[in-house]
Amino acid sequence: RVHKVLIAEDVYYPGESETKEFYMSVLLNRGKGRNMIMYSTEGGMDIEEVAEHTPHLIFTEEIDPAVGLQGFQARRIAFNLGLSGNAFKEMVKFIDSLYNAYIGSDASMFEINPVLKTSDDKILAVDAKVNIDDNALYRQKAYADMRDIREENPIEVEAKEVGLNYVDLDGTVGCMVNGAGLAMATMDLIKYAG
């Protein structure tokens, strides 16, 4: 059942044969404690399918959170996507804006698929999926207003209302802990033990 629909402007560009679609996302690489831009020349399709059949077409750029995205990194991404001239410059600006939006919104993931290069070398985000960290919604009032708790796990919502952090997991094993670090370590040990 649909409870809320957000509407965005439709984009039409003539000369579709001269357009090119890319994939790009910004997310946290938890293993390395760094943000990462994942990108591919194969936009407009399911990235999991690309990863399974043609993993060599997916690239990553790790970003040190202490210094943020550097200009050379954005240029390397645009170069690896095969762009040149004005399209190259526009993609560098797009990547910088995308990363700043990711950081500024306290997102855990920003995925644009496809990123469209138009026939006149403009770069557009045609479709996006964004996950905002629930724990940052107090800082992100504009996004908090868009939140639809009917789309969330009702048990997790109820726990949050009484000041508890609750994560609903698959299976039959439960874990009650008093900190995120202990929770992660305990879950890792349970998984390791089988």
Located regions from the model:
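ATP-dependent carboxylate/acyl-activation modules
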Residues: R1-H3, D10-I112, L116-G194
